[in-house]
């Protein structure tokens, strides 16, 4: 997606068939919406035809390699991450959804995306690249791994309960996502420690269940209820 200012209006084009068309358009901002696997390749392909004052932008959920690429490109940039997708979010009402803007980004680029995300009623947070990766490792890898485990041990149910059906819907939605995207999120260097936390909690819970420890279960439920307040 390429954008440029015409007077005080923003002119946006999202369909180009050749690099020459992009060159003639002379964009002031390029938003790279390629899938995670091809984000860097897409940038490298168009860099030679972009004006030097063009702002590069991505909306990738995985930022691996992007900071280094931007710093070496010589271009200004703005990196953001809408923390939702069409699988689960209600795109007609995004007021409960969030977006992250990378703090190292160019000032004008940040202003553009703040205005855009505010117009969608999103909750906006500004994180560094490192803080973003830490957040993704926590907020995505934990539910992803938990869902994977549910799917792995699941058996077909003739009369599933409400909770089971809700978990099933989440599992089907998550597993419809691109394999490479799931892989890259889980291969975040910060993910293993989050998965280790899950294993620790499962071990503790299994001991309580195996021992039929009513007092231990009461304490455990009290602890986790406090977590979700």
Regions found by a protein language model. Give the residues of each.
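Single conserved hydrophobic/aromatic residue that forms the stacking wall/gate
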Residues: 1-12
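Rossmann-fold dinucleotide-binding core
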Residues: 62-66, 70-124, 133
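Rossmann-like NAD(P)-binding element
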Residues: 20-47
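Short acidic-hydrophobic, aromatic-tinged amphipathic segments that line or gate anion-handling sites
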Residues: 15-19, 125-128
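Conserved acidic residues
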Residues: 14, 28, 54
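An accessory alpha-helical subdomain
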Residues: 126-229
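Redox-cofactor binding/interface segments in oxidoreductases and associated redox assembly factors
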Residues: 30-32, 57-58, 101
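A short helix->loop->beta-strand "cap" motif at the edges of active sites that frequently abuts
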Residues: 50-54, 75
């Amino acid at each position: 997606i390429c954008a440029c200012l015409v007077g005080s209006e923003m002119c946006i084009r999202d369909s180009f068939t050749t690099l020459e068309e992009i060159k003639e358009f002379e964009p002031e901002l390029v938003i790279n919406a390629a899938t995670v696997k091809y984000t860097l390749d897409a940038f490298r392909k168009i860099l030679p035809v972009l004006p030097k004052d063009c702002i590069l932008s991505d909306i990738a959920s995985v930022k691996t390699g992007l900071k280094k690429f931007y710093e070496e490109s010589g271009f200004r940039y703005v990196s953001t991450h809408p923390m939702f997708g069409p699988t689960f979010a209600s795109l007609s009402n995004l007021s409960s959804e969030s977006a992250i803007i990378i703090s190292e980004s160019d000032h004008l680029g940040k202003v553009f995306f703040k205005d855009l995300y505010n117009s969608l009623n999103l909750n906006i947070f500004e994180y560094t690249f490192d803080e973003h990766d830490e957040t993704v490792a926590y907020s995505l890898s934990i539910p992803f791994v938990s869902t994977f485990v549910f799917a792995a041990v699941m058996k077909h149910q003739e009369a599933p309960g409400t909770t089971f059906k809700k978990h099933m819907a989440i599992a089907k939605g998550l597993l419809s996502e691109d394999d490479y995207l799931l892989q890259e999120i889980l291969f975040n260097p910060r993910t293993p420690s989050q998965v280790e936390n899950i294993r620790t909690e499962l071990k503790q819970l299994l001991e309580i269940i195996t021992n039929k420890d009513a007092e231990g279960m009461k304490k455990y439920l009290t602890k986790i209820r406090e977590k979700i307040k």
